[in-house]
């Protein structure tokens, strides 16, 4: 029953055969399909390259003709035009300034001329002459003979002036009195004495030196302006001790060299003297 149904159905089972035959026919008529497609692809690529080259040429031409293009002779020409334009503008401005100055000068000249015309010219007045009376000739007094009475009066005149001598003596006495008072006042005024505080290091010969005797020798030095202070024994090493003693001296009377000379005179006990500290008071 199924086969009978298929026998009555209208189905084209051989259609693929006809399609293959038609394809082969057209292939033979138009040539191979692969070669044709390759040619079309090559032509399209060439056309695209040509179009791209045209676009690039147009863009380059448009860029060179634009205002921002400064490379090449075209750019130099545009820069030159800009500079010329700026120079022309500056020239016009300078011309305007010059014209303003000329107008101001002309106004000043007109003002001066008007002032000169309005003010009258002063007339030169001659100075008034003073009438001077003629000088009279003065006759010298006639010398008269001196009488004996006048000669006696001239002899009685004290030419040296005893009054002036008394005044000079009084002035000298006052001057001496003032000098004496000034000297007394200056003597009563206390004078500042420059003093210094010195710390001395007195070193013995060895550890067997009697340090008490050494200190006694040092303190036995008595000078004007020298005052001895506190002292102590400072260990040096190997059982040896040095005498460290303080003193105050007046700078004008006692010096460090004098102190060293006086202390080093005790050769049996003293080896050397050093200044450990020196301060102004």
Swiss-Prot record:
The modification N-acetylalanine is found at residue 2. The modification N6-acetyllysine is found at residues 17, 107, 117. GO terms for cellular component: cytoplasm; eukaryotic translation elongation factor 1 complex; glutamatergic synapse; nucleus; synapse. Keywords: Acetylation, DNA-binding, Elongation factor, Nucleus, Phosphoprotein, Protein biosynthesis, Transcription, Transcription regulation. It comes from the Eukaryota. Residues 113-172 are annotated as: Disordered. The modification Phosphoserine is found at residues 37, 44, 60, 86, 106, 119, 133, 162. Residues 149-169 have a biased composition (Acidic residues). Residues 80-115 are annotated as: Leucine-zipper. Residues 173-281 are annotated as: Catalytic (GEF). The modification N6-succinyllysine is found at residue 117. One of its GO terms (molecular function) is DNA binding. The keyword DNA-binding applies. The modification Phosphothreonine is found at residues 129, 147. Residues 115-132 have a biased composition (Polar residues). SUPFAM superfamilies: eEF-1beta-like. Belongs to the EF-1-beta/EF-1-delta family. EF-1 is composed of 4 subunits: alpha, beta, delta isoform 1, and gamma. Isoform 3 interacts with HSF1 and NFE2L2. This is Elongation factor 1-delta. It comes from Mus musculus (Mouse).
């Amino acid at each position: 029953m199924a086969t009978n149904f298929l026998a009555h159905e209208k189905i084209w089972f051989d259609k693929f055969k006809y399609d293959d035959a038609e394809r082969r026919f057209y292939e033979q008529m138009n040539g191979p399909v692969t070669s044709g497609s390759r040619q079309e692809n090559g032509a399209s690529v060439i056309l695209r390259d040509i179009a791209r080259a045209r676009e690039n040429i147009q863009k380059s031409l448009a860029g060179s003709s634009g205002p921002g293009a400064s490379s090449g002779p075209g750019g130099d020409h545009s820069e030159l035009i800009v500079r010329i334009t700026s120079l022309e503008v500056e020239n016009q401005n300078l011309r305007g300034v010059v014209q303003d100055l000329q107008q101001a000068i002309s106004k000043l000249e007109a003002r001066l001329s008007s002032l000169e015309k309005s003010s009258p010219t002063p007339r030169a007045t001659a100075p008034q002459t003073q009438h001077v009376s003629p000088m009279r000739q003065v006759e010298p007094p006639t010398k008269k003979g001196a009488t004996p009475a006048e000669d006696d009066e001239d002899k009685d005149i004290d030419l040296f002036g005893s009054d002036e001598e008394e005044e000079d003596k009084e002035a000298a006495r006052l001057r001496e009195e003032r000098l004496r008072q000034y000297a007394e006042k200056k003597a009563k005024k206390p004078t500042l004495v420059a003093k210094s505080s010195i710390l001395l290091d007195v070193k013995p010969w060895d550890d067997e030196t009697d340090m008490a005797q050494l200190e006694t020798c040092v303190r036995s030095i008595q000078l004007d302006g020298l005052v001895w202070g506190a002292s102590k024994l400072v260990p040096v090493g190997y059982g040896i001790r040095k005498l460290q003693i303080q003193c105050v001296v007046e700078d004008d009377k006692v010096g460090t060299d004098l102190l060293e000379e006086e202390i080093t005179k005790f050769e049996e006990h003293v080896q050397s003297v050093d200044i450990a500290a020196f301060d102004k008071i």
